[in-house]
Amino acid sequence: MALAKRIIPCLDVDNGRVVKGVKFENIRDAGDPVEIARRYNEQGADEITFLDITASVDGRDTTLHTVERMASQVFIPLTVGGGVRTVQDIRNLLNAGADKVSINTAAVFNPEFVGEAADRFGSQCIVVAIDAKKVSGPGETPRWEIFTHGGRKPTGLDAVEWAKKMEGLGAGEILLTSMDQDGMKNGFDLGVTRAISDALGIPVIASGGVGNLQHLADGILEGHASAVLAASIFHFGEYTVPEAKAYMASRGIVVR
């Protein structure tokens, strides 16, 4: 039987408020994270992802207090990321109520940290977040590069090869954001989504660019992702999670 595909609302949190930007800039406020998470829990979201988008840039630790409040209200898996640099950071987040922890910038500077985290806590709770940007020109073989620090710093790392390396070190899941598409609302970058999904044996979550329900289905059917993540289409009331599930089911996708 086909595994159900997951729909994951994403909360980008900046100083305790949910925000949404375009290509990682031009931020607008979307509300209180705990209230928003509770709404998605009631709507039947499969999981929730909470990313403290200020953490890596400012060197701040993810807001444990907000995670604790959220975990007390939300009874679906909660992935938390942002500024995760040490095993103790992961332990603190899991103790606060996170089910999975997302590692981004720290994985690039110290790949062995991913292996250490997977050994300590189990691959099932270690997510590696990849922010990728297309760097190949027209007519060239498609190539995507990893960026860090909230999409500000290029690394020179090839996104597909990097994702394979992370799987080898023990990551249980890849959260893949296309920086070219983020907040643009014209669909996922299906090229990089498919390239990484097809190269790996672990689930890939597609992120960055959802503007309508067709985009969610395309991420699964054309991007071969295991799960799709969206923010603004849910936060600002354009669509609900049940509407998204009904549409995906109508396209022949197995949903919970």
Curated annotation (Swiss-Prot):
Catalytic reaction annotation: 5-[(5-phospho-1-deoxy-D-ribulos-1-ylimino)methylamino]-1-(5-phospho-beta-D-ribosyl)imidazole-4-carboxamide + L-glutamine = D-erythro-1-(imidazol-4-yl)glycerol 3-phosphate + 5-amino-1-(5-phospho-beta-D-ribosyl)imidazole-4-carboxamide + L-glutamate + H(+)
EC code: 4.3.2.10
GO MF annotation list: imidazoleglycerol-phosphate synthase activity; lyase activity
Pathway membership: Amino-acid biosynthesis; L-histidine biosynthesis; L-histidine from 5-phospho-alpha-D-ribose 1-diphosphate: step 5/9
Keywords on record: Amino-acid biosynthesis, Cytoplasm, Histidine biosynthesis, Lyase
Keyword Iron-sulfur part of the UniProt annotation: no
Compartments where found: Cytoplasm
Pfam assignment, any one: His_biosynth
Gene Ontology cellular-component annotations: cytoplasm
Source domain of life: Bacteria
SUPFAM superfamilies recorded: Ribulose-phoshate binding barrel
Classification via Gene3D superfamilies: Aldolase class I
GO terms, biological process: L-histidine biosynthetic process
NCBIfam families reported in the protein's UniProt record: hisF (TIGR00735)
Function: IGPS catalyzes the conversion of PRFAR and glutamine to IGP, AICAR and glutamate. The HisF subunit catalyzes the cyclization activity that produces IGP and AICAR from PRFAR using the ammonia provided by the HisH subunit.
Protein's name in the database: Imidazole glycerol phosphate synthase subunit HisF
Taxonomic source organism: Pseudomonas putida (strain GB-1)
